[in-house]
C-alpha cells in the first residue's frame, strides 16, 4: 500500500525551494510546533523563525530554515510562504553565531531609541538557524 502524501510547496520571496509529495511537515507555528499530515484540517497561520522538517514520499527527511512566514493547509496541498528559506546545508554557522552575539549585545546595551522588536527578531532568526545546524549535526552523528 502506498504511503499517504500531500503536495507541499515551500517558496521564498526569490524562488521555489521545494515542491513535491510529503508524508509529514513540521514547522514552528505562532502557537508552538505544528505537524501537518495528509488529511489535516484546512488552516492558515503565521509561522515563526525556525526549522521546517519534511518527510518525503520515499521516507527521506529534509530540513530547512524558515525566517517566518505563512502556512496554508488545504485538503490537497500545503503551502509555506517565507521571506527567507535556506536548506540546512546552506546555513553559515559562523555568521549565525555572530548575528546572535550582535543581537544579544545590542539588547544588553539598549538606549532610549533602541528598537527592541528588531533586535529580538534578529536574535530569534539567528537562534533558529543555529538550531537547524545543531539538528543536522545530531542526525549526521547517528
UniProtKB/Swiss-Prot annotation:
UniProt keywords (A-Z) are: ATP synthesis, Cell inner membrane, Cell membrane, CF(1), Hydrogen ion transport, Ion transport, Membrane, Transport
Any one GO CC term of this protein is: plasma membrane
Q: What is its main location?
A: membrane
How does the UniProt record describe the way this protein sits in the membrane? Peripheral membrane protein
Question: Ion transport among the record's keywords?
Answer: yes
Q: Where is this gene product found?
A: Cell inner membrane
Which molecular function GO terms apply here? ATP binding; proton-transporting ATP synthase activity, rotational mechanism
Q: Which domain of life is it from?
A: Bacteria
* Keyword Cell membrane (UniProt): yes
**Pfam families attached here?**
ATP-synt_DE (PF00401), ATP-synt_DE_N (PF02823)
The record's listing under CDD domains reads: F1-ATPase_delta (cd12152)
The similarity annotation says: Belongs to the ATPase epsilon chain family.
Q: So what does this one do?
A: Produces ATP from ADP in the presence of a proton gradient across the membrane.
Looking up PANTHER family in the UniProt record yields:
ATP SYNTHASE DELTA/EPSILON CHAIN, ATP SYNTHASE EPSILON CHAIN, CHLOROPLASTIC
Note the subunit structure.
Answer: F-type ATPases have 2 components, CF(1) - the catalytic core - and CF(0) - the membrane proton channel. CF(1) has five subunits: alpha(3), beta(3), gamma(1), delta(1), epsilon(1). CF(0) has three main subunits: a, b and c.
Q: What is this protein called?
A: ATP synthase epsilon chain
Task: Give the organism, scientific name.
Answer: Shewanella woodyi (strain ATCC 51908 / MS32)
Amino acid at each position: 500500500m502506498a504511503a499517504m502524501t500531500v503536495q507541499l510547496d515551500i517558496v521564498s520571496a526569490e524562488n521555489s525551494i521545494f515542491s513535491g509529495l510529503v508524508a509529514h511537515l513540521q514547522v514552528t507555528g505562532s502557537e508552538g510546533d505544528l505537524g501537518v499530515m495528509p488529511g489535516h484540517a484546512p488552516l492558515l497561520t503565521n509561522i515563526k523563525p525556525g526549522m521546517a522538517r519534511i518527510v518525503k514520499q520515499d521516507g527521506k527527511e529534509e530540513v530547512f530554515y524558515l525566517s517566518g512566514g505563512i502556512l496554508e493547509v488545504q485538503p490537497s496541498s500545503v503551502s509555506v510562504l517565507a521571506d527567507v528559506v535556506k536548506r540546512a546545508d546552506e546555513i553559515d554557522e559562523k555568521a549565525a553565531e555572530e548575528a546572535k552575539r550582535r543581537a544579544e549585545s545590542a539588547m544588553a546595551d539598549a538606549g532610549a531609541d533602541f528598537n527592541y522588536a528588531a533586535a529580538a527578531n534578529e536574535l530569534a532568526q539567528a537562534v533558529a538557524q543555529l538550531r537547524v545546524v545543531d539538528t543536522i549535526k545530531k542526525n549526521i552523528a547517528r
